[in-house]
Every structure is written in structure tokens, then in C-alpha cells.
Design a protein with these regions (language model features):
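Juxtamembrane interface at the cytosolic side of transmembrane helices
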Residues: 469-495
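Membrane-embedded alpha-helical bundles of multi-pass enzymes
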Residues: 2-219, 387, 420-423, 427, ...
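Active-site catalytic loop in hydrolytic enzyme cores
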Residues: 86-93, 138-170, 293, 309-370, ...
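Active-site beta-strand/loop signature of hydrolases that rely on acidic residues for catalysis
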Residues: 43, 81-85, 136, 230, ...
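CN hydrolase (nitrilase-like) catalytic-core segments centered on the catalytic cysteine
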Residues: 265, 279-299, 306, 353-354, ...
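Soluble catalytic regions of membrane-associated enzymes that act on cell-envelope
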Residues: 217-334, 348
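Non-cytosolic juxtamembrane linkers/loops
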Residues: 206-260, 389-392, 399-400, 409, ...
């Protein structure tokens, strides 16, 4: 860690821009509103880039100011998701989420502000992005919802920005989008030396250049060879989970037969019906017959009851008669409590490529998405969204494609039918209606190995370690530093 000498770091050399309490609250509200726009189910990509500026301005001056700024910003940040959280997880868990979000931003803001008093600008500006990235990593590791709710998804409309996820996952995206605002905010709060400002500008410029070159290279690396035709089919005609197979299949089967391409894939949604073991066997037969008739691989999701045990499953039927089942690994708390989770990924070698099978919530979890890295080149994902989160559900899956270098075909009830290439570019996307929604796309059967796919969250864990070490170090060092001349002056005054 770079630590300058005490003489360089005196608070006398760094006059602090101070605001009154009302102005600090207003700045905190502005920062929170920008963060809220980034956390929203339909986010504004530009908002998180600006949020650190008012946040760090409000935090400057004292520890109390930093805690106030972080608390106000964190409380406002969660407001865009409150109605969604209340409907999805209820009051008690929503309150816990709010408290954790507020506490996270208080911690990150306080640590960033304290670092400005002890570190050069080029180092201090890394603290807020790195700390928030560390918190995001810990969240996705311990939360049953994985990386759902991450600020990283705000950038899914800025496809060049999210390419850094192929290097460091969600934490890398968070770090990148908060970095320029952190520089701007700290730049304005103190009277930094000219050399400090130049060093900080050079560092941010180099990081921005590196990220840009990497994104340009990745987005322009075109896969060669043939493609795999994909058909995505879904309808919102049925309410909930139908209790029988025949009526559901009578509606889906004509669309499958009419639209499937020989040698291609057909992906249907999650939970088409709730079936007992015998019904699941009949469903497998019907889907297998459709696969043989069309020459396409057909994937469909059903919930299966075996005596007193329930499973959320995906069925893959191949033209050669193979039938493969996959059990969903990550279940939605409060909505799928009766289901028993699976514990392993499933790969299928077919149509000249290697498929990976996942179901909806699985792809909200980077760890599960990474199980398929370097193995699958195309992910098939039956899904069932909540309607209002259709865009976000699709984009969370899309980011797994960027992280791991595979293409994705996703078909969701109450959501979108969509396909993405290995860089996360949208190939096709359409909202599902009560009518039968059918779209087609062509996916490359060739994946692209990524650093994140091989090494996982190394960057995120580095952020965690550095944030902890910095917090411990700051707790052991007195504040503020006094130069030796100031110490002498203090001793003379004491005499």
C-alpha cells in the first residue's frame, strides 16, 4: 500500500471544502437519487457514474458528515426497489435489506473520506470504488439471491462498459463505474497538490484506456464457422403453474412443430406444468416425439412431484432419443420453498456444440454461471419472471454470458424471449404476451474463455482484503496527521 510521509499529509496542506448540515443532506439526497436510478429495475446507466461526486462532497469535513452522507444516500438508494421487495420478500426481509444497504454506504463513504486525510489522491480515489466492489462481492456470496440487485446491471445498456466483467465479474463493473466520480468528488473536496492531481489523472486515464482497449478487442473478435439456429417460444396464457400437461402441450406443440429448425434448438419456459412422476414421463415422451419429428433439440421446464418431494426441472429431448433432466440449483426464497434444489451443472454434447442447462434464478448467481465456463458454449435457460422484473431478469442472465464467454438462449413466462452472444450483445429480444410468442436467432457454437471464468472473483476478494486492511490501518493511525513542525508548535504552546 502506498503511504506518503506525514509531512505531505497534513490537514493544514489540504483545506477541506465544508458544507453546512442542510447542504450535506441535500447532497446526500442527490447522491441517493442517482444511486436509486442505478439500482432500479429499469436503470439509467449514467446515474451511478455521477453519484460519487455529491456523495463525497457531502462527506467532506468530518466523520459525522461522512456517516450522514452515506446514511442518507443509502436510504434514498433503495427507494426505487421498495415496492418490488415488499411484494417479493415481505416487510421483515425488506427492512433487513434496507438496513444493510444503508450500512454498506455508510461504511464505504466513511472509509473513503477517512482515506483522503491520509493517502495521496491517486490512492484515495480507489477507496470508494474498491470498497463498494468488496461489499457487492460479499453480498453475492452470502445472499440467496446471488448478485440480484447489484449496481452492475445498470450498465447492461452500455455493452462496452460491462466487458470488464470478463476480467473480474460484478466487482470489476462496480469499480469501473464509480472510479471517475470518485476522482471528481475528491478533486473538489480538498486543495490537493498539483503533483497529486496529475498522478490521479494519469492513473484514471490509464485504467480507462485499458478498459476501452479490452472492450474494443473483445467486441470485435468475431467467432468463425457455422451457427446454431435457436427458436424461443413462450406464452403468458396460463396462470400460475397448470396442474396437468395435456392442455399445456396442446398449446405449445403446434408452435414447436411449426417453428423448429432441423439441427437447431427450441427453448420453452420454466414451470410449464406441475406433474407427478407419471405425468413427467408422459411429458418427456411428448417432447421427445417433437424433437424426433423436427430434428431439433427441445428444452422445457416443469415442476415434478415425486411422492412428497418437489423438483424444479428442465427437460432436454434430443432427436436421437436422448432425454436429459436438470434440477434447478438456486431456488427463489419464499416462492420455491417446497422444491428440493439440485447440486450439479448438466452439460449435453449435441448439435455440434456443448450445451449447458440452467433455470431462471440459477443465472442470477455468478458462481453457478461460472460452473459452465470453459465447458458450455451455449446456455439454454427456461425461466419464469414476475413481469415487472422482466428486463432485469433478462439482463442478469446476459451478464453471465459476458463473464463466462458463452451464448445464451432464454425463454421466460411473464418476461422476455431473448438470445445473447458471448459478449452480451442482444441478438433478439421480445416481450412475451398472452399469444404464443415465437422468435428465432442464430448462436455461435464457439465460446470464448475468460479470465473470470478461469479464476473467479479474484479481483473482488482483493478488494475485500484491501478494504479490511485499510480499515484496520485507519483505526490504528491518529487523525489528523501533524507535521513535525506542527507537533513542535503544539509542544511549545503547551509549555
Amino acid at each position: 500500500m502506498l503511504i506518503a510521509s506525514p509531512n505531505r499529509l497534513t490537514t493544514h496542506d489540504r483545506s477541506t471544502l465544508r458544507f453546512g448540515r442542510p447542504a450535506q443532506i441535500v447532497l446526500g439526497v442527490i447522491a441517493g437519487a442517482l444511486l436509486s436510478a442505478g439500482y432500479a429495475l429499469h436503470p439509467q446507466w449514467w446515474a451511478p457514474w455521477l453519484a460519487p461526486v455529491p456523495l463525497l462532497l457531502a462527506a467532506s469535513g468530518s466523520r459525522r458528515s461522512a456517516r450522514l452522507a452515506g446514511g442518507v444516500a443509502g436510504a434514498i438508494a433503495v427507494t426505487s426497489l421498495l415496492p418490488y421487495y415488499l411484494d417479493l420478500i415481505g416487510w421483515p426481509v425488506t427492512l433487513l435489506v434496507v438496513l444493510l444497504r444503508v450500512g454498506s454506504w455508510i461504511f464505504a463513504t466513511s472509509l473513503a473520506d477517512a482515506a483522503t486525510r491520509r493517502l495521496p489522491l491517486a490512492v484515495a480515489l480507489l477507496v470508494l470504488p474498491g470498497t463498494v466492489a468488496a461489499i457487492e462481492l460479499l453480498t453475492l456470496v452470502v445472499s440467496p439471491h446471488g448478485a440480484a440487485g447489484s449496481l452492475a446491471y445498470s450498465q447492461m445498456e452500455a455493452i462496452g462498459v460491462v466487458q470488464v466483467a470478463a476480467l473480474g465479474g460484478v466487482p470489476a463493473v462496480i469499480f469501473l463505474i464509480l472510479l471517475p466520480g470518485s476522482l471528481a468528488g475528491l478533486w473538489l473536496t480538498r486543495n490537493w497538490r498539483h503533483s497529486d492531481r496529475l498522478a490521479a489523472l494519469a492513473l484514471v486515464g490509464l485504467l480507462a484506456l485499458a478498459a476501452t482497449l479490452f472492450s474494443v478487442f473483445r467486441l470485435n473478435a468475431k467467432p468463425s464457422g457455422s451457427t446454431v439456429p435457436v427458436t424461443l417460444i413462450a406464452t403468458n396464457h396460463f396462470d400460475g403453474i397448470p396442474q396437468g400437461w395435456e392442455g399445456v402441450w396442446a398449446r405449445y406443440q403446434p408452435a414447436v412443430i411449426a417453428s423448429a429448425t432441423r439441427g437447431g434448438l427450441v427453448v420453452l419456459p420454466e414451470k410449464l406444468a406441475l406433474l407427478d412422476s407419471e405425468g413427467a414421463g408422459r411429458a418427456a415422451q411428448d417432447v421427445a416425439m417433437a424433437a424426433q419429428a423436427t430434428g431439433a433439440v427441445v428444452i422445457a421446464g416443469v415442476e415434478v412431484r415425486e411422492r412428497d418431494t418437489y423438483y424444479n426441472r428442465a427437460l432436454l429431448a434430443a432427436p436421437d432419443g436422448r432425454v436429459v433432466w436438470y434440477d434447478k440449483q438456486r431456488l427463489v426464497p419464499g416462492w420455491e420453498d417446497r422444491d428440493t434444489p439440485g447440486n450439479a451443472p448438466v452439460f449435453v454434447d449435441i448439435v455440434g456444440t456443448r450445451l449447458g442447462i440452467a433455470i431462471c434464478k440459477d443465472m442470477h448467481v455468478p458462481e453457478i454461471g461460472r460452473q459452465y465456463a470453459g465447458g458450455a458454449t451455449i446456455m439454454v435457460v427456461p425461466a419464469y419472471d414476475f413481469g415487472r422484473d422482466a428486463w432485469m431478469g433478462a439482463r442478469m442472465t446476459d451478464l453471465r454470458a459476458v463473464e463466462n464467454g458463452y451464448a445464451v438462449a432464454r425463454s421466460a413466462r411473464n418476461g422476455f424471449v431473448s438470445a445473447y452472444d458471448r459478449t452480451g450483445r442482444i441478438l433478439v429480444e421480445r416481450p412475451v404476451t398472452d399469444d404464443m410468442t415465437v422468435v428465432t436467432a442464430s448462436l455461435s457454437p464457439h465460446g470464448a474463455a475468460t479470465l473470470y471464468g478461469r479464476n473467479g472473483d479474484v479481483f473482488g476478494w482483493c478488494c475485500v482484503c484491501l478494504a479490511v486492511l485499510l480499515r484496520v490501518w485507519l483505526g490504528r493511525v491518529s487523525l489528523p496527521y501533524l507535521s513535525s513542525s506542527n507537533k513542535s508548535l503544539s509542544r511549545n504552546q503547551a509549555k
